[in-house]
Amino acid sequence: MALVRSLFVSNKILGGSLAGMRKSTSAPKGFLAVYVGESQKKQRYLVLVSYLSQPLFQDLLSKSEEEFGFDHPMGGLTIPCPEDTFLTVTSRIQG
């Protein structure tokens, strides 16, 4: 089972394994779907749930809480930052 060490553009999966993944609207076990962007059109990414305990990712979550509180317009976790910032943060977490 190969680990994904970079962004797969077609699936937008950060970290973790692609084994057994099917295209669906729900996130596979061990992953969390987040919506990223500052415009109305946000990109959906799947990140490992372990990212939730990372201080860099928690900073992004704090920004989301400040902007949206607990009322997320996308119906899921929305992170209001530029995609390149999000990708920089997640790449630092991946090591």
From Swiss-Prot:
Distribution of this protein across tissues and organs: Higher expression in thermo-responsive cultivars (e.g. cv. Alst-1, cv. Ang-0 and cv. Com-0) than in low thermo-responsive cultivars (e.g. cv. Dja-1, cv. El-0 and cv. Kon).
Topology in membrane: Peripheral membrane protein
GO annotation terms (biological process): auxin-activated signaling pathway; response to temperature stimulus
This protein's GO CC annotations: plasma membrane
Chief place where the protein resides: membrane
InterPro entries cross-referenced by the UniProt entry: SAUR_fam
Keyword Lipoprotein: no
Record bears the keyword Chaperone: no
Keywords, ordered alphabetically: Auxin signaling pathway, Cell membrane, Developmental protein, Growth regulation, Membrane
Induction of synthesis: PIF4-dependent regulation by temperature. In low thermo-responsive cultivars (e.g. Col-0), higher expression at 28 degrees Celsius than at 22 degrees Celsius in petioles but not in leaf blades. In high thermo-responsive cultivars (e.g. cv. Alst-1 and cv. Ang-0) higher expression at 28 degrees Celsius than at 22 degrees Celsius in both petioles and leaf blades.
Annotated compartments: Cell membrane
Null mutant phenotype: Reduced rosette weight and area at 22 degrees Celsius but not at 28 degrees Celsius.
Extra remark: Exhibits a high natural sequence polymorphism between cultivars, thus conferring thermo-adaptation to environmental conditions.
Complex formation: Interacts with PP2C-D1.
General function of this protein: Functions as a positive effector of cell expansion through modulation of auxin transport. Involved in thermo-responsiveness of plant architecture. Enhances plasma membrane H(+)-ATPase.
UniProt family annotation: Belongs to the ARG7 family.
Name of the featured protein: Auxin-responsive protein SAUR27
Encoding gene (name): SAUR27
